[in-house]
From Swiss-Prot:
Cofactor: Mn(2+)
Lineage of origin: Bacteria, Pseudomonadati, Pseudomonadota, Gammaproteobacteria, Thiotrichales
Pfam families assigned to the protein according to its UniProt record, in alphabetical order: iPGM_N, Metalloenzyme
GO molecular function: manganese ion binding; phosphoglycerate mutase activity
Keyword Glycoprotein belongs to the record: no
Name this polypeptide is given: 2,3-bisphosphoglycerate-independent phosphoglycerate mutase
Cofactor note: Binds 2 manganese ions per subunit.
Amino acid sequence: MKKTTLLVILDGWGYSDSDYFNAIKNANTPTWDSIWQEFPKTLINASSLEVGLPRSQMGNSEVGHVNIGCGRVVYQELTKIDKAIEEKTFGDNKAICAAIDNVIKNDSNLHLIGLLSPGGVHSHEEHIFEMIKIAKQKGIKRLYLHAFLDGRDTPPRSAEKSIKKADKLLQDLNLGYIASVCGRYYAMDRDNRWDRVEKAYNAIVNANADFIYDSALEALEQSYARDQSDEFVIPTCIKKDGHLVKVQDNDSVIFMNFRADRAREISHAFTDESFDHFPRKKHLNINFTTLTEYDSKLKCAVAFPPKQPINTLGEVLMKNHKTQLRIAETEKYPHVTFFFNGGREEQFEGEDRILIPSPKVATYDLQPEMSAPEVTDKLVAAINSGKYDCIVCNYANSDMVGHTGNYEAAMQAIEYLDKCIARLKDAILEHDGNMFITADHGNADMMVNPETQKPHTAHTTNLVPFIYVGHKKAQVALEHGKLSDIAPTLLNVMGIAQPKEMTGKTIFNFEK
């Protein structure tokens, strides 16, 4: 019977001493409080340069899981693209040039789709603005921007500033206009809610939408009048001079998001010949280009293809003939699999995966426990089975409920997680295993912005906890650690040599 080493990632569980709308600190968490007092712990960095992001940029789930799983600081797409723009090589990118050449050759249209936001989590609006400028420089005559609106990694009603910037740039360059707007709730689903994606797709491709207005700003104002914040703006088309824009054969579409998980579904709708999740009028003959690789199965050009890291935690465990399990509910399943493995889709030998469906609710404040009960049941059963050397799991609650801005619901989510942690603690200690508890970034630790007194729905840059729960004697060996130090710590407790590619350091020393 194997002694399991369990890594619990509490998504969005940051640490803050402030009790100002801090759902984590103010919730009733007897198990967490006792673990915090009784077991070795420290705080580690999950944002900024320490996870390969620009200075002061908040971390996110993709970045967090990549850094944890790879055991080294992995420089993120945001940083790479910023560097290409700074060095003026962005416009020389082969995939981008091919998309633009296709438009010029066919005298067709260039469509940019993506999250128009300064959030820096899934995209950055500066990348969109740079692409618009490059298109003008290279001779594009007609460019249409299909803007997905944020309100999740940014304040809920903050899109006006971004829309005005885009409008002004397009007008100054006499290049085109914003042809549709849509909340990310529709265009960037990742939970197989294809009815949402269908509405976004039809607005972009077929100019078929519930609402049509004369400008993107008017569309936003009318959405607010219906009490729909940025994230939930119903897909809307913009009519200019009596003209509605459609995507047609021989057009080029460039998807400007750099993060994969919420870009996959709508990309498949654009590119899959045998797509069957909702009816399309036809399969378009277009040049479809993505800024980064969203899914290796997508038939499209990729501007910044990934470099597969070697000797990630999963690969090292496989090479040492260890069994491993990855488990999460739908919202975070790609993070403990694809992202944790450094962008690898395939399972390693000896790696099992369990996907628990996320509840089908409009927003997760309606069901703060999400699918944590089912995740915990499977985890406890896996620990009791003695089958696995290493288990990696993710609890989505503190992030997904935190994103709703509902403080009371976030506290309920935290309190439910506390009960789940109690069950895991009992199972691990009973079987003489090791449990590490951490987070990939903060969120529920600040539910209201103290400066604006408005709901704070974005991630925080706060440090995150790293706790060891087990019978071994452990001492903190590394102050000011970071997410990339977690994998070396797990290898240390399991008695496995750390490969040279892992540049992280062990956070705890354990008595032999």
